[in-house]
């Protein structure tokens, strides 16, 4: 039940000791890690993007059957010679040599992006933090490429971007998470509800 459009709290009629709080998906990860939330639903991408010390304080109880999305590396459509990460690595060295700068990668996921690019041997880049509308960055001159979360790929396509053939950084989904501070007790309780 809820008491209004602006109310962030709810309850379950036959479970008065359960309190529901509506939070931003990133906030859920933070609150689970510090123990102020016992259980939360958020994205696997947000857990994996968080610092390792936070990840170590959270248990994945279940992967849920909604919220599917992929974190991908996308380049402008007119980069016809860039189809793979290896091609991107070559371009990054060209940019470094010819412009004396680094390939700029706009992203809301700096940790996952950095880990992915380094694991693929791409080293000549600079991350550009994005707070939203990341797809616009290459066309306003703020970056050459992006990494972003996508479900259908339509927004990328509508903005003249395409995913590299081997540009899948992470397959994400909504997950039911538990704070490790109370994981055994909460896990048993959740099992009794389901």
Located regions from the model:
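Domain-level signature for soluble enzymes in the chorismate/prephenate branch of the shikimate pathway
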Residues: 1-194
């Amino acid at each position: 039940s809820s008491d209004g459009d602006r109310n962030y709290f709810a309850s379950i009629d036959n479970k008065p000791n359960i309190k529901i709080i509506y939070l931003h998906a990133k906030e859920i990860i933070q609150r689970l890690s510090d123990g102020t939330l016992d259980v939360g639903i958020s994205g696997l991408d947000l857990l994996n993007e968080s610092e390792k010390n936070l990840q170590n304080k959270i248990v994945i109880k279940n992967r849920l059957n909604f919220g599917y999305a992929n974190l991908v590396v996308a380049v402008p459509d007119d980069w016809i010679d860039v189809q793979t990460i290896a091609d991107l690595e070559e371009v990054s060295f060209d940019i470094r040599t010819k412009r004396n700068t680094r390939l700029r990668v706009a992203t809301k996921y700096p940790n996952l992006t950095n880990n992915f690019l380094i694991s693929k041997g791409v080293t000549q880049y600079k991350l550009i933090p994005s707070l939203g509308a990341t797809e616009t960055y290459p066309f306003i001159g703020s970056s050459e490429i992006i990494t972003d979360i996508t479900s259908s790929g339509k927004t990328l396509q509508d903005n003249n971007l395409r995913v590299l053939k081997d540009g899948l950084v992470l397959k994400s989904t909504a997950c039911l998470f538990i704070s490790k501070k109370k994981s055994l007790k909460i896990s048993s309780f959740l099992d009794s509800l389901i």
